[in-house]
C-alpha cells in the first residue's frame, strides 16, 4: 500500500526514528540520493530522489509533513497515532523506549522513475 502511494505521487515524504540511526551508526539520508522503493513482496515499484532531510522532535512534526506522508486522512493526529505505535514497536525490539520528544528524521522525495 505505501509503495503504491509513493508510485502514484500521493506519498512524498516519510519519517524514521532517529535513535535507530544512532544505534546502527547509520548515516542519515542525503539530499540528491536515490532509493528503490519495494512493495511488500520485495518487488521494485519505483525509484525516488531525496529532496529534503531534516530532524525534529516527534511532537514538532508539522501538519504539512503529515499531509505529505499521504497516509490515512493525512491529518497530523492520524500521523502521530500511527507513528507513535510504529516507532514504539520498532524501538522496543532493540530495547529502547518511545518518547514524544524523540528525534524523528523527516525525508521528502520525488518519484524519478516508475518500475
Language model segments and positions:
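Contiguous surface segments at macromolecular interaction interfaces
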Residues: 70-115
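Loop/turn positions that initiate beta-strands
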Residues: 31-38
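Short beta-strand-centered aromatic/proline hotspots
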Residues: 45-54
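Short, surface-exposed secondary-structure edge patches
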Residues: 23-28
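Compositionally biased, charged N-terminal/linker segments
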Residues: 1-22
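Short, solvent-exposed secondary-structure boundary/capping segments
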Residues: 56-67
Amino acid at each position: 500500500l505505501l509503495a503504491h502511494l509513493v508510485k502514484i505521487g500521493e506519498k512524498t515524504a516519510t519519517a524514521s526514528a532517529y535513535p535507530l540511526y544512532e544505534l546502527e551508526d547509520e548515516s542519515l539520508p542525503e539530499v540528491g540520493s536515490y532509493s528503490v522503493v519495494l512493495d511488500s513482496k520485495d518487488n521494485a515499484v519505483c525509484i525516488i530522489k531525496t529532496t529534503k532531510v531534516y530532524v525534529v522532535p516527534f511532537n514538532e512534526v508539522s501538519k504539512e509533513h503529515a499531509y505529505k506522508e499521504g497516509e490515512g486522512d493525512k491529518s497530523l493526529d492520524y500521523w502521530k497515532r500511527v507513528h507513535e505505535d510504529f516507532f514504539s514497536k520498532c524501538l522496543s525490539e532493540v530495547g529502547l523506549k518511545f518518547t514524544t520528544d524523540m528525534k524523528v528524521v523527516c525525508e521528502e522525495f520525488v518519484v524519478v522513475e516508475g518500475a
